[in-house]
Amino acid sequence: MLRNEKQKLRVLFCHSIRLHYLCNMINYDLKKIKAIVFDVDGVLSMQTVAMDAEGQPLRTVNIKDGYAIQLAQKLGLKIAIITGGHSDSIRKRYEYLGVEDVYMKAAVKTETYAELKKKYSLSDDEIMYMGDDIPDYQLMRLCGCPCCPKDACSDIK
């Protein structure tokens, strides 16, 4: 792994996220992280959703997030998506980026999270989760390193 690439990844993530208060960063070793799990709406896509002529939601994604995800994978991190929503275009986007674990319509995110941990034999301390709203709260309490976008709802910050 190239040192320069690790620095780029750190800058990309630290620029756009706020580490959650549940994660005591003073004593936390980010080197433990083996997987990063993301929510979609409000995290990897904008908080506003346009609708097409058939009433299907149209979401926009940030190209820099895609670059950061690919770089994280290149550095050996497992990337997963756990979202309560469903969008074929979002699924295709992250599959295109090489994300193998894209869980849509996750009614209870903590159950999907437990499946993911079991699949890869991960502990909570080895997982970073980024969420932005109340449905993410319980999962953020479980993972080793919860974080959120700067514009997350105040209850999550």
Would you name each region that the model predicts?
Residues 69-92, 103-104:
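Substrate-recognition element of Asp-dependent hydrolases with the DxDx(T/V) motif
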Residues 36, 79, 102, 146-148:
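Short, well-ordered beta-strand core segments
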Residues 105-110, 151-154:
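Short, acidic/turn-prone active-site loops that include or flank metal/cofactor-
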Residues 113-137:
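Conserved Lys-Pro-Asp/Glu-containing loop-to-beta segment of HAD-superfamily phosphomonoesterases
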Residues 69-74, 114-121, 141:
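Surface-exposed amphipathic alpha-helices with a cationic face
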Residues 128-157:
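Acidic, Mg2+-coordinating phosphoryl-transfer loop and its flanking beta/alpha structural elements
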